[in-house]
């Protein structure tokens, strides 16, 4: 698997992956995360333009997953409740990690790529996203506390 920047021509497949991810979340008990068409095509276009959107591709170049990776402070991480960050060092943030569900190891490939770029990585997920929580725990992430994202929901 390889990671590369998302190109605008990838947008239809990336949006299909997010459609699949929303349906998967609903089917696994996560009914309140990524609602109302989130993430929107406009948001992903902006992330492509900003150089923050990436895709994970298979041996034939097929897109298997997508995510956002941003180096630098995330405004939603400035306040943490019922806990504390592990350190105050500069960090990278992973957002909107999703796969098409057709191949194992895609999430891990994306996480590996992020850690190769920056050793201090933060990620948040919804309390009902048990699948992502399992992946993050397996990968060695530790729960640090609660943050609130832009729409006011807890992570």
Label every PLM stretch briefly.
Residues 124, 142-155:
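Conserved catalytic-core motifs of GNAT/GCN5-like acyltransferases
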Residues 117-128:
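Conserved GNAT acetyl-CoA-binding A-motif
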Residues 2-16:
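A short beta-loop-alpha structural element at the N-terminal edge
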Residues 128-146:
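Conserved active-site alpha-helix within GNAT-family acetyltransferase domains
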Residues 68-102:
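Conserved acyl-donor/pantetheine-binding loop and adjacent beta-alpha core of acyl/acetyltransferases
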Residues 55, 62-73:
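Conserved beta-strand in the GNAT
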Residues 99-116, 133-138:
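Conserved acetyl-CoA-binding loop-helix of GNAT-fold acetyltransferases
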Residues 22-42:
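Conserved GNAT-fold acetyl-CoA-binding loop/helix
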């Amino acid at each position: 698997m390889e990671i590369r920047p998302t190109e605008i021509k990838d947008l239809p497949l990336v949006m299909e992956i997010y459609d699949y991810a929303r349906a998967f979340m609903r089917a696994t008990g996560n009914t309140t995360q990524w609602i109302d068409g989130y993430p929107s095509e406009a948001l992903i276009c902006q992330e492509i333009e900003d150089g923050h959107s990436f895709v994970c591709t298979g041996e034939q170049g097929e897109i298997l997953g997508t995510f956002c990776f941003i180096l630098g402070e995330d405004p939603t991480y400035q306040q943490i409740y019922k806990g504390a960050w592990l350190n105050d060092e500069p960090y990278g943030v992973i957002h909107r990690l999703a796969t098409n569900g057709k191949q194992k190891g895609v999430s891990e490939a994306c996480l590996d790529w992020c850690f190769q770029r920056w050793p201090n990585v933060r990620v948040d997920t919804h309390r009902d996203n048990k699948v992502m929580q399992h992946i993050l725990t397996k990968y060695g992430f530790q729960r640090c506390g609660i943050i609130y994202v832009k729409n006011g929901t807890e992570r």
